[in-house]
Amino acid sequence: MKKKIMITGSEGFLGGRIAAYYEGRCEIIRVGHGDLDISDEGSVAEYLNGKNPDVVIHCAAVSNTRTCEDNPGLSEAVNLKGPVNMAKGCKENGSRLLFMSSDQIYAGSSLERANKEDDEIPFVNVYGTHKKQAEDEILRILPHGICLRLSWMYDFPVRGLKSSSNLLTNLIQAMVQDRPMRLPVHDCRGITWVQEVVKNLEPAMDLPGGVYNFGSENVLSSYETGKRVFQMLDKNGNRKSLVVPDEASFKDNSRNLAMDTGKVKGCGITFLETVEGFSKCLNSSPEYIQALIGDSIVEF
């Protein structure tokens, strides 16, 4: 019998790709914005009882950090109450919950190393605050719940699936338009190919309950990362100056969103390091890149 998986946020960048990947292998229940008000506890309980999924992958969120700062009430309803309601419904229904959390929890980190799940980090933004509070509440209600802290992700545009602004498409666009792209020097974060996240969700369904950093590690600044990926795209090196350093952003308080993934590695789940992940992604579809930027594409 196929496993029944319910995916909230199934019209989004991540949720849509999860649904597309597992379609056919599992029975997929797609839950979009118009299908369920996740901020309504009764509606969530009724929906889960009706669908009776084995696993709930909760991707639904307001993920734009600026929107959350400008409208904290909306963020609380969707990013805190929504996952808490899902945890309550999963407890009642006996479903396994995988909650998509965020590396933005580490936005206040002053550590000079990659962040670990149990590091005490001060809250500095609304989105990260609500994600952390949701994790805590989920595990209180549902100790076997799984909270996966995701990094910034990227992918090629895929017909029928939502695209989002990401480093890969931004770099390609800069090359196509022959315009400079500024990336911060005082910023370190992992950046993950979304397909790695999607595929690793299958073994993640069997993880012990808890919080896990779930994405690519990185020790490079965003500027250095972008420069290296751009070099993969520009084999002749004649457009390398398009990636320029942004010295101003985070100058007074360097940002460190980098994640230590030792915990999930110990459970047998691995991710490529950030630059290696970009290389594998580009190698998977060289014809797509060449159609956009022609002979500038590196020969892998």
Residue positions per predicted region:
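Catalytic helix-loop patch of NAD(P)-dependent Rossmann-fold dehydrogenases
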Residues: 77, 82-85, 105-148, 154, ...
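SDR active-site strand-loop-helix element
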Residues: 8, 31, 56-60, 97-103, ...
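NAD(P)-cofactor binding segment of oxidoreductase domains
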Residues: 56, 70-98, 132
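NAD(P)H-binding glycine-rich loop region in Rossmannoid oxidoreductase-like domains
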Residues: 38-78
